Amino acid sequence: MNFNQLIDHTYLKPEATKKNIDNLIMQGFEHNFFSVCVNSIWVKYVKEKIKKLNSNLKITAVVGFPLGASITQAKAHEAKLAVEHGADEIDMVIAVGFLKQKDYEYVLNDIKSVKKAIGNKVLKIIIETALLTKEEIKKATEIVLKSGAEFIKTSTGFSYRGASLDDVVTMKSVIKDQKLEIKAAGGISTLEDMQKMHEAGATRFGLSKSVEILKNQKVETKY
C-alpha cells in the first residue's frame, strides 16, 4: 500500500527555522505527502512557498499546542487566523485536565468553538493518550464524536509517549462505523507500526521521519 497520501509530514519543534521548514516543504512536495504540519507562526510562510511550487500540498496547523491549556477564545482565534493565513486543516489539543476531572461539557464546548471558528476546514482533535487511562480515551472519543470534528488524534509528540496500536484499537472500538477518522501521531518508528495501525483503523499519520519510515528504515524516537 502507498501511505504517502495518508501522511501529515511534521515539524513542530520550537527551535524551527526557515531552513527546517523549507526542508519540510520540499520533502512534502517531492514525496507527495498529504500535508505539512507546522506551528501557526509558519502558516503564511508555508503557503507562499507552496504557491511558488504550484503544488497541491496541504497545510495543517496546530492550535493550543502542545498543552491544550489555553483558554477557548485563544484557541478559536489562533485557529481562525491560521485558516486566514492558508491552513487547510487544524490539529487542536483538548483541555486534558478538564477531561480528567470529568468536566466533559467544557471539553466539548472547547472543541465546538474551534470548529465554529474554522467553518468547513478539517478539524483534528488531539487527546494526548499518554496522559489518559483507557476509559478516558473512550470518553474522549465519545466527546469528539459529538463535536463536529472530522478526526481524533492520539498525541502531540511532546508527552512521554506517542501513538500506540492499543490507542487506535480503543478509539475504533467506540467509533465503530460512525463518521470520525483516526490520526495516529508521535513515536511511530517503522512502516510495520503504520501498517498495523492502519489495519486497526487509522487513516492519517503524523510523522516527522516520514521519508525514512517509507524507505522501511527504523528510526529513533525520543521515547
UniProtKB/Swiss-Prot annotation:
The gene is deoC. It is found in: Cytoplasm. Pathway: Carbohydrate degradation; 2-deoxy-D-ribose 1-phosphate degradation; D-glyceraldehyde 3-phosphate and acetaldehyde from 2-deoxy-alpha-D-ribose 1-phosphate: step 2/2. SUPFAM superfamilies: Aldolase. Its EC number is 4.1.2.4. This is Deoxyribose-phosphate aldolase. HAMAP family: DeoC_type1 (MF_00114). Catalyzes a reversible aldol reaction between acetaldehyde and D-glyceraldehyde 3-phosphate to generate 2-deoxy-D-ribose 5-phosphate. GO terms for cellular component: cytoplasm. GO terms for molecular function: deoxyribose-phosphate aldolase activity. Keywords: Cytoplasm, Lyase, Schiff base. Belongs to the DeoC/FbaB aldolase family. DeoC type 1 subfamily. It comes from Mycoplasmopsis synoviae (strain 53) (Mycoplasma synoviae). The lineage of its organism: Bacteria, Bacillati, Mycoplasmatota, Mycoplasmoidales, Metamycoplasmataceae.
